[in-house]
Each structure stands twice: as structure tokens, then as C-alpha cells.
């Protein structure tokens, strides 16, 4: 069977390109054949002559099938280690995992001594249940001022599932946590160890796009969109396929690790070389990219009164930041704020009043709606809200 042989130091980049073309066979495994080379199984649709951006050689070798699904992870776990151990798993280990691209993220906690064998059995059982998972990461919570996940490699799938001390012998390139998300046919590149991303908001992004299309039709022109907490750009990625939806765009994030991904994820920037950005930079006629504190950026009078749509996705602090962001919106035409917030469930009944209070002198011209999206822990809720402000 045809495989693409590539150097391990270019493996992740080439894998992403191959997947972008839908040329990787899902029935067989990517595996290592030499210390510095891996092979990627190819579908029958792959042409004999590959595009110039794909580095490697086509080779003919026997494929290694992906394992068949052996049942639920609990069934596999119980078979290997005993039914009683399932009930003994602590809260973080028994909590559901999350899949981001070809990566599984498993909530866990650090052990003072060596990790118990049953933890590796748990990871192995889940990877057997999900044969397309390449890498599993332990999730120890969040860290740092950018609140990115504190992640550690738990296992990698090569010709077999590699765990524990054996991971030290694996080339770093094969342990890369960079991955590609597919949302509604769109591709979003990211590294969950470096940047924040929530796949749970995909439906929110679809809803946002639909409503902004209606808003565009109402005001009869492309929308000027300001996303001050853009991350790697998932909200914006959903907008670009719709011709005439977006006009000027300001995409900002405080985390510098997000900026290179904006150049890979936003279609108008993909043909550009990545630019180091310190502050704010006009990178195309319509797009500004910024790497700075959102409140500092919002205080720039050059940005005031310019934007039709404001995204506010800083759930733990959205309501505290919002009063400082209102001046960014246009006053001569309708404008929209699309935001998300995490707040105590007991405060949901007063959320509309709080938002009206934040709007101050523009509150009489505003319409507010919100929906509870999910529970966040025992006492809090994630809320998505819309504010429509009529012209003054």
C-alpha cells in the first residue's frame, strides 16, 4: 500500500497538510519506520505527483490496520484491571475526556510518587475505544495569566500505544500537541498546550454566523467586526466563507502564542508570512492584528465608534470588561455585542438588569437576550448573551 515517508522533524506539518486534502487513510496507522522517519498511509485518491508543499517520498509497504473498537473504555478497563477499580477512580480521572482534533485530553491530577498502573490502563482503554486518537494529554487544570491548560503527554499512538518511561525515547516531533480541528467543514489549527480553545462553543459560532448574516442584510453592507479576545480566531474563521459578510476586522489576543495561528487560520492571512506583532498592526487593507491588553486597546480613541460587532469572549471577566468596550461601537447605525460569561447561577435572574446598567446612557436604545449554555461546576453557569444597540 502507498505511504508517504517523511522526516520526523516535519511530520506534524505534513500530516496536517495531508489531512487538509483528506488524503490520509483512516483505516491504517501512521507509524515510525526509522529513527528519523515516519510513514503516513494514503488513500487511493492521492495523485502520483504531490503538491510542492508536501515533502516526502511515496513508498510501498504493508499497512498496519487501526485496531477495531473493542467496546466502551469501561469494558476494556474492567477486563484488564477489574470491575472494582472503576468505582475507585477519583473525580478527575472518572470525569469525561475531551477530544480536540486527533488529541484526547484526560482530566487528571499529579501524583507525588510514580503514577499508578491503573491510570495508564485507563488511558490505554480510552485510546483503544478511539482508534483515530494520536496523542493523549493529562489535564491538570489551568495555569498562567493566559489561563491555558496545564497539559502533559500521557500516551502516543505509533505502531502501538506508547506510555510511561518509554515516552522519553520518542522523538519530540512525534509528541507534538499541535492539531487541526474541523468545524463545519472549516479547519482551525492550534496547540492546546499553548492557547485556549473550546470545541464546546462550535454551535455558538454557527448561531453567531447565522445572526450576523441577517444583521448584514439589514444594514446592507459588510460588518466591521472587533474581536478583542480572539484566541486562534474560531469566531472569525466561521465568518469568512460568507461573501460580503465582513469588512474591517480587528483581531486581538493578549497571548502571543495565538498570533501565529491567526496567520494560519484566517483565510486572508494564509498567503502572508507570519509577522511578529508587538501592539497593533494593519496586516491587510481590512485586517488589523493586535497582541495587547484588550482594555488598553479599547482606550485607543482611534478605535472608538468604528465597529458594528463586538465579540466579548472572556467568560470569567466579560462583564467586568464590558463597560470599557462600549465606546468601540458605532453610534450612527445599529450595533451588536455577542458575549459569553460564567457567573453564579443565583445571579441569572438579575443578568439583564446588570447588562442594562453596564450600557448606561445607551441602555434605553438596547435590546438584551441571553441563554444558559451549560452548567459550569456545581454553582455556576455559562451564558451566551446578545446586546443590540439602536443608533442614537
Identify the function of each model-found stretch.
Residues 1-392:
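SAM-dependent transferase fold signal centered on methyltransferase-like domains
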Amino acid at each position: 500500500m502507498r505511504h508517504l515517508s517523511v522526516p520526523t522533524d516535519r511530520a506534524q506539518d505534513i500530516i496536517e497538510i495531508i489531512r487538509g486534502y483528506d488524503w490520509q487513510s483512516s483505516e491504517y496507522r501512521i507509524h515510525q519506520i526509522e529513527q528519523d522517519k515516519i510513514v503516513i498511509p494514503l488513500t487511493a485518491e492521492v495523485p502520483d505527483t504531490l503538491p510542492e508543499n508536501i515533502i516526502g517520498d511515496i513508498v510501498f509497504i504493508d499497512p498496519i490496520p487501526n485496531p477495531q473498537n473493542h467496546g466502551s473504555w469501561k469494558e476494556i478497563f474492567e477486563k484488564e484491571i477489574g470491575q472494582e477499580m472503576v468505582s475507585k477512580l477519583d473525580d478527575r480521572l472518572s470525569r469525561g475526556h475531551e477530544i480536540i482534533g486527533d488529541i484526547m485530553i484526560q482530566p487528571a491530577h499529579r501524583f507525588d510518587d510514580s503514577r499508578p498502573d491503573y491510570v495508564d490502563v485507563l488511558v490505554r482503554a480510552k485510546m483503544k475505544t478511539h482508534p483515530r486518537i494520536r496523542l493523549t494529554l493529562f489535564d491538570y487544570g489551568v495555569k498562567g495569566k493566559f489561563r491555558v491548560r496545564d497539559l502533559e503527554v500521557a500516551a502516543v499512538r505509533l505502531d502501538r500505544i506508547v506510555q510511561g518511561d518509554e515516552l522519553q525515547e520518542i522523538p519530540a516531533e512525534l509528541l507534538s500537541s499541535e492539531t487541526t480541528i474541523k468545524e463545519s467543514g472549516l479547519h482551525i489549527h492550534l496547540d492546546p498546550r499553548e492557547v485556549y480553545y473550546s470545541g464546546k462553543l462550535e454551535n455558538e459560532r454557527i448561531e453567531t454566523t447565522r445572526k450576523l448574516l441577517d444583521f448584514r442584510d439589514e444594514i446592507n453592507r459588510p460588518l466591521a467586526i472587533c474581536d478583542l479576545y480572539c484566541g486562534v480566531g474560531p469566531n472569525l474563521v466561521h465568518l469568512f466563507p460568507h461573501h460580503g459578510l465582513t469588512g474591517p476586522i480587528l483581531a486581538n489576543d493578549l497571548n502571543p502564542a495565538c498570533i501565529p495561528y491567526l496567520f494560519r487560520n484566517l483565510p486572508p492571512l494564509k498567503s502572508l508570512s507570519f509577522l511578529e506583532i508587538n501592539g497593533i498592526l494593519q496586516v491587510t487593507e481590512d485586517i488589523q492584528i493586535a497582541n495587547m491588553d484588550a482594555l488598553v486597546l479599547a482606550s485607543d480613541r482611534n478605535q472608538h465608534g468604528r465597529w458594528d460587532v463586538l465579540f466579548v469572549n472572556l467568560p470569567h471577566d466579560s462583564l467586568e470588561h464590558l463597560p470599557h468596550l462600549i465606546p468601540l461601537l458605532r453610534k450612527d447605525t445599529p450595533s451588536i455585542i455577542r458575549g459569553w460569561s460564567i457567573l453564579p447561577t443565583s445571579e441569572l435572574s438579575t443578568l439583564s438588569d446588570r447588562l442594562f446598567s453596564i450600557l448606561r446612557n445607551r441602555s434605553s436604545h438596547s435590546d438584551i437576550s441571553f441563554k444558559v449554555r451549560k452548567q459550569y461546576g456545581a454553582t455556576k453557569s455559562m451564558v451566551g448573551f446578545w446586546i443590540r444597540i439602536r443608533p442614537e
